[in-house]
A protein has these predicted regions:
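Class I S-adenosyl-L-methionine-dependent methyltransferase catalytic core
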Residues: 2-18, 22-33, 37-497
Length: 497
């Protein structure tokens, strides 16, 4: 949070002292650390914005998050009284039918309000519950947070087990479940009160094998947002390797309790370090596949209308990085029987980029949306403007010709293609692979993930961006139960040697 030039004096809320600089240091020195934490929390409760708090106390947004988490026990965006319920369901709701989900509003029906930082939109569990369960089925959320999934399960007549390792999150969930449904609206549905308790997703004690019909999980990202003030077992406090190691236990437990043929959905995103992406999402997908799951769908959760302007747009162009604007929602299935792995047979084509027009407003986030009839021209123009020129850009399109029973044959095919272009690639240049997920035998082959896994063994390539490209006019209906795959990926690698 940058200090504003509009405020010339700052007043200590504890002793009334006025000074020409933020009062945070004064409060800590004269009144103590605990008084400082409570003063910040009081300002938050009074409705002061994050920017105003940052200016008043001289703290960053990250510091504010840690202070609120310490004061309240859970990371929330506002400290307010329970909301007044104005509606019990979303208006004009329809099931999503493509692999890109984006919601204009976060969702504020029932007790949903989005105060819990990192909570997912209630549209996500509503879609999952309605698509993959029937009334009376059992839904499990092992990272319940503010209770979004539990509230939706109660509204939709499903049984629910809701657990979280943070006691403050459990208390918040219980508060959000304190409502009585009007029988005039729900007279045909049986209402089940969710079973809410403190619990560790790595050890789902008390839940029988093969007993759950749907798992909805939104685990804390490794080191992205602090969800607790130091609760033992909080995955958000771990670095990426530790996070993935603990998620293996989570995946194993989810596999154990899920019924064969049932679904497990996990919302997860990526991180960034040194202006390069860390593919936590694809690594997490790999963890669940190793546990025995099959990938039924791979949804891109897009931030709606996320287009940067001003400061962040300038920073994106100046330092050549894209702002993360998407997450992954892999929907796994516990197989009901044997289904042998089928390895994709790949082919690759080098795409020549010539005479690309200059882009007046270059893309600055990881989600690129273009008109369908002009998608490829605008996509290639953005690629060339950001990564081309003298940087020696090479674009390779990877496609699947067929599949065959096997294990890892696709690795050889991709590396063979790269061997043709890497000798000509210059240090500081870029190799970009255009890939799409494909569906075979009812399951999704995550070709982008497979490609990234393969290229980890090539030291001169450093993954810089995972870009998702999609048309602006997505279909609103579908004739199949499967989601229509509408997105593609651009995997941007920097040549380091």
């Amino acid at each position: 949070m940058a200090n504003s030039l509009l405020q010339s004096t700052y007043t200590c809320p504890l002793c009334g002292l006025q000074q020409a600089k933020p009062v945070g240091a004064h409060i800590r020195q004269q009144h103590g650390e605990e008084a400082f934490v409570q003063a910040v929390a009081s300002a938050k409760r009074a409705g002061m914005s994050d920017a105003q708090i940052g200016e008043q106390f001289g703290i960053t947004f990250k510091q504010l998050e840690r202070i609120i988490t310490k004061a309240v026990g859970v990371n929330v965006s506002t400290l307010s009284k329970p909301k007044r319920i104005k509606s019990w369901e979303p208006t004009d709701f329809r099931l999503e039918n493509t692999t890109v989900w984006s919601f204009k509003q976060r969702g504020n029906w029932a007790t949903h309000d989005g105060r819990y930082r990192g909570n997912w939109s209630p549209y996500i569990p509503r879609n999952l519950i309605l698509r993959y369960t029937k009334p009376g089925d059992l839904v499990l959320d092992p990272f319940v947070g503010g209770g979004t999934t539990a509230v939706e399960a109660k509204l939709l007549g499903r049984r629910c087990i809701a657990r979280d390792i943070n006691p403050a999150s459990v208390e918040m969930t219980l508060r959000n479940l304190r409502f009585n449904l009007p029988r005039t609206l729900f007279e045909e549905s049986h209402i089940y009160e969710p079973e809410v308790s403190i619990g560790d997703a790595r050890h789902l004690e008390g839940i029988a094998d093969n007993s759950v019909d749907l798992i909805c999980a939104h685990p804390p990202y490794a080191g992205i947002i602090s969800y607790t003030s130091g609760v033992e077992g909080d995955l958000s406090q771990l670095d990426v390797p530790e996070f993935l190691r603990e998620m293996r236990q989570v995946a194993s437990e989810c596999y154990r309790v899920l019924k064969p043929g049932s679904k497990c959905a996990v919302l997860i995103g990526d991180a960034r370090q040194r202006k390069h992406v860390i593919p936590i999402g694809f690594h997490t997908i790999g963890v669940f596949l190793e546990a025995g799951f099959h990938l039924k769908e791979l949804v891109i959760k897009r931030q709606h209308n996320c287009r940067t302007t001003g400061f962040w747009a300038d920073r994106s162009l100046e330092h050549n990085f894209l702002l993360l604007a998407h997450e992954y929602l892999p929907i796994f299935e516990k197989p009901a029987g044997a289904s042998p792995y089928r390895a994709p047979l790949l082919s690759s084509t080098i795409v020549e980029l010539h005479d690309t027009p200059k882009v007046s407003e270059p893309e600055t986030t990881t989600v690129w949306v273009f008109p369908c009839e002009d998608l490829e021209r605008k996509m290639y123009a953005n690629l060339y403007q950001r990564y081309g020129g003298e940087n020696n850009l090479t674009l390779i399109r990877v496609t699947v010709q067929d599949t065959q029973p096997g294990t890892q044959d696709h690795h050889v095919d991709i590396q063979t293609s790269l061997q043709q272009v890497l000798p000509q690639a210059r240090q500081g240049g870029f190799v970009i692979l255009e890939v799409r997920d494909v569906r075979f035998d009812g399951y999704v082959l995550p070709l982008a993930k497979m490609t990234i896994d393969t290229l980890q063994g090539i030291p001169q390539l450093w993954l810089k961006e995972i870009i998702v490209v999609l048309p602006d006019d997505l279909p609103t209906s579908s004739n199949t139960e499967e989601l229509q795959i509408v997105h593609r990926y651009l995997l941007v690698y920097e040549v380091t040697a």
